[in-house]
A protein has these predicted regions:
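Conserved CoA-thioester-binding segment of acyl-CoA-metabolizing enzymes
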Residues: 1-60, 94
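C-terminal alpha-helix plus adjacent terminal tail
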Residues: 1-15, 49, 167-173, 192, ...
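Catalytic-core regions built around general acid/base machinery
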Residues: 42, 88-100
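Crotonase-fold acyl-CoA enzyme core
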Residues: 95-207, 241, 246-249, 255
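Hydrophobic alpha-helical segments typical of transmembrane helices
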Residues: 81, 88, 92, 147-150, ...
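Terminal peptide-recognition signature
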Residues: 20, 24, 39, 57, ...
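Glycine- (often His-adjacent) and acidic-residue-rich active-site loop
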Residues: 37, 51, 59-92, 111, ...
Length: 262
C-alpha cells in the first residue's frame, strides 16, 4: 500500500483495548486479498503490543463484512490467485485462535460468507438487533467450503448445515440461539456493551488470559483422556504462577488482586 492509499484496516487504542476496524465501506468491507493482508498485519501488531489486553474487531459503514470480494474473484480466474486469496484468509482465521489475547467481534449490518467466517473465528461476538448473518454461497453455485470450517466448530451440526444448504439470512436473535454470537443489543447500545465486556476482561491477569485461551483451543481436538492430562498439567503450571497466588490470597482476604503479569 502506498502513502496515498486509504488504509483498508485501521487501528485505534482505547486504554487496554485495541479497536480494529475493517475500513472498505464501498465494498461492504469485503475480504479482498489486500484487506486480509492488512488485517493480518494489524492483528500481529496488536498481539505484540504489551499495552493491549483485548482486541475488538468491527466494520465501518453499513455492515461488518459481506465476505470475499466477488468482483475481484471474477477478475482473477486462475488457481494462483484463488490459492493466494484463500491462504491469506486462512492465515487470518487461524491466527485469531492462536493469538494470545481475546478477540471480540462487534457486528452490525451483515456478516455473510467469509464475513460470517470471521465472526465465527473470534473468541466472542456481539451483534446489534438489525444484523443479518448467512453462508449464502450455495445460492450462486459456490458452496461456503472455507467459511464452514469455523462455523461448524462454533454451532451445532444441524444449524450449520441449515445455514450452508439453504443460504438464507438469519437474524441476530437466531444467530444467538444457534450459538454463533454471544448476545444481541440495540444498535445504539452495541459498542458500549462490547466495551463493557472488553474492559471486564481487561481486569483479569494477562498471563492467565493468554494461558487459558491457549489451553481452550489446544484441548478441543484431543480425546477426552488426553485433554484431561493436558489440562491437568496446565492447571498445575497455573497454580504455581505468581498471579494465581496473588488471586487466591486476594479472594481469601477479601481485597482486589494486584496482578503482577498485567
Amino acid at each position: 500500500m502506498n502513502s496515498q492509499s486509504k488504509a483498508l484496516v485501521t487501528l485505534q487504542k482505547e486504554e487496554e483495548v485495541s479497536l480494529i476496524t475493517l475500513n472498505d465501506e464501498s465494498s461492504f468491507n469485503s475480504l479482498s486479498e489486500n484487506l486480509l493482508k492488512e488485517l493480518f498485519a494489524v492483528l500481529k501488531e496488536s498481539d505484540q503490543d504489551v499495552t493491549t489486553k483485548v482486541l475488538v474487531l468491527k466494520g465501518v459503514g453499513r455492515g461488518f463484512s459481506a465476505g470475499h470480494n466477488l468482483k475481484e474473484v471474477q477478475e482473477n480466474q486462475n488457481d494462483d490467485f484463488y490459492r493466494d486469496l484463500l491462504n491469506s484468509c486462512k492465515e487470518v482465521m487461524t491466527f485469531l485462535s492462536n493469538l494470545s489475547k481475546p478477540v471480540i467481534a462487534e457486528v452490525h449490518g451483515v456478516a455473510t460468507a467469509a464475513g460470517c467466517q470471521l465472526v465465527a473465528s473470534c473468541d466472542l461476538a456481539y451483534a446489534d438487533s438489525d444484523t443479518r448473518f448467512a453462508t449464502p454461497g450455495v445460492n450462486i453455485g459456490l458452496f461456503c467450503h472455507t467459511p464452514l470450517v469455523p462455523v461448524s466448530r462454533t454451532i451445532a451440526k444441524k444449524h450449520s448445515m441449515e445455514m450452508l444448504l439453504l443460504g438464507d439470512l438469519i437474524d441476530a436473535t437466531e444467530a444467538k440461539r444457534f450459538g454463533l454470537i454471544n448476545d444481541v443489543f440495540e444498535p445504539e447500545e452495541l459498542h458500549k456493551k462490547v466495551m463493557e465486556v472488553a474492559k471486564t476482561i481487561c481486569s483479569k491477569s494477562s498471563y492467565v488470559l493468554k494461558m487459558g485461551k491457549e489451553t481452550f483451543y489446544k484441548q478441543l481436538d484431543m480425546e477426552l483422556e488426553e485433554a484431561y492430562e493436558y489440562a491437568t498439567e496446565r492447571m498445575i503450571e497455573n497454580l504455581k504462577a505468581e498471579d494465581a497466588r496473588e488471586g487466591i490470597d486476594a479472594f481469601l482476604t477479601k481485597r482486589n488482586p494486584n496482578w503482577k503479569n498485567s
